[in-house]
Amino acid sequence: MSLRPFETPGGLSSLSPRRRDFSPTRPGTNGPSAKLEHVTERFAGLWTDLEQEKQNKRIQESTRFSLLQESLQRIEKSVEAEVKRRAESDKQLQSHFEGEIKTLQERQLQQFTDLQLALKSAVESLNQRITDLHALVRDERESRRSDIEHLATSLVGKVNECVAAIDEERNGRVQEQTVSMKRVGEDLMLLSQRLDTEKNTRDSEVSALRAEVHDAIGNRNLADDQFKGAVLDEVAGLKAALALEREERIAEDDEIVQAVNDYTKALQEGLKLVSA
């Protein structure tokens, strides 16, 4: 019987593609040899199955590769046909667009020619209108010049009349202003006299008021000095009271500390007696 090699008893780690034939001895149907032969037969069947599966996979891959090549050939033919069809279509589109562009160019050229003719006619008409307008402006200028000369002559006469009237009015106003200034001067003189009298009266009143204020300030300074002395006396009394209270508190604190020390000493002596 032919056997396949195996490596580990825990599982199949690797199978060799080559077979090793050997003929084991069969000492008996029962025992370790029979079990080993049974295991060997099972591995031999597994090897055969693996070889068959490998062969089937190769056949399937070969068939799949053949189908893939046929598909690629069909795709290449389809692509070539599509490329040819698109090339023909591009040529047709190019010829169509060239015809359309040529027609459009001819149409634009015709429109440009018509527009140029219309523009030329409009420019000629505009030139004629400008010429007519220049003639009208020249005639209007001559007419306006004569009118302006006539108006200037009449305006000079009116200006002279206005200047004479203004001079007459100016002389009248100068006389009126002279009379008014004389009256204002007299009024200012009377007002100045009244102001001087009022100033003297106010100065005398201010002097009297200043004397009264000076007397009031002197009395107030005396009252302030008296108040300041009273306040200083009260402050000194408060300072003395505070010092006395501080000394009393210090004495009380010393007495409290001495009492605490005496109590602590007595407590320590009592503890010593208890411990003894």
Curated annotation (Swiss-Prot):
Q: Name one Pfam family in it.
A: SF-assemblin
Keywords for the protein's UniProt record, in alphabetical order? Coiled coil, Cytoplasm, Cytoskeleton, Microtubule
Does this UniProt record's set of keywords contain RNA-binding?
no
Top-rank taxon of the source lineage equals Eukaryota
Cite a single GO MF annotation. structural constituent of cytoskeleton
The record's region (Disordered) falls at: 1-37
Q: Where is this region: Nonhelical region?
A: 1-31
Report the coiled-coil segments: 67-145
Keyword Transferase (UniProt) = no
- Subcellular localization, per the record? Cytoplasm, Cytoskeleton
Which region ranges are annotated with the description Rod?
32-276
Question: Its GO CC terms?
Answer: cytoplasm; microtubule
State the function annotated in the UniProt record: Major component of the striated microtubule-associated fibers (SMAFs; system-I-fibers).
Family the UniProt entry places it in = Belongs to the SF-assemblin family.
| Comment, domains | Consists of a small non-helical N-terminal domain and a rod domain with a 29 residue repeat pattern based on four heptads followed by a skip residue. This alpha-helical protein is characterized by the ability to form a special segmented coiled coil and to assemble into striated fibers of 2 nm protofilaments.
Q: What is the protein name stated in its UniProt record?
A: SF-assemblin
Q: Which source organism does the UniProt entry give?
A: Chlamydomonas reinhardtii (Chlamydomonas smithii)
Q: Mind giving the lineage of the organism this protein is from?
A: Eukaryota, Viridiplantae, Chlorophyta, core chlorophytes, Chlorophyceae
